[in-house]
Structures are given as structure tokens and as C-alpha cells.
UniProtKB/Swiss-Prot annotation:
One of its GO terms (cellular component) is ribosome. Pfam families: Ribosomal_S20p. It comes from the Bacteria. GO terms for biological process: translation. This is Small ribosomal subunit protein bS20. Binds directly to 16S ribosomal RNA. The keyword tRNA-binding does not apply. It comes from Oenococcus oeni (strain ATCC BAA-331 / PSU-1). The gene is rpsT. One of its GO terms (molecular function) is structural constituent of ribosome.
Amino acid sequence: MPIIESSIQRERLNKAERAVRAPQISAYRTAVKNFEKAAAAGADNLQELFSKTSAAIDKAETKNLIKKNKAARDKARLYKLLKAATSK
């Protein structure tokens, strides 16, 4: 339990920021997992799912939830999955 007033304020602000960011990170991760599951199952709408997942990744990057390089890496991996699934 912090005693210094600035520490108390930072703790309160951190809690509020976590409450905002947690659902956003969860939405990003869910979009990626849904695409990976669909690619493994051989779904028909992979191109549409890829565009939605790519948008979710870009949104997470814009809000500084993930770094720029991680966003690029994730999109490259998902694109590789898309190409592998559609070439079959």
C-alpha cells in the first residue's frame, strides 16, 4: 500500500488504464486466435477474416498496445497462413 500521495495517484491511474487496455488487448488476441483456428479448419472466408484480423492488429498498434515490429511480424505470419491455406 503506497504512502506517498503521488504513488497513490499513480496506482489509481494505472488501475484505470489497465481497465481500458485489457479488453482491447483481449479483442486483438481473440481476432488472431479466430483466424488461426479458421485457417487450421480450412474455412471458406479466410480472406475476409484476414482483413478483419489485420485491422485489429493495426488498431492495437495505433493504440500502442503492441509495438510496430510485433504488428508487422504478426501480420506476416497470418499472411503466410492465409497463403498456405488457400493454395491447398
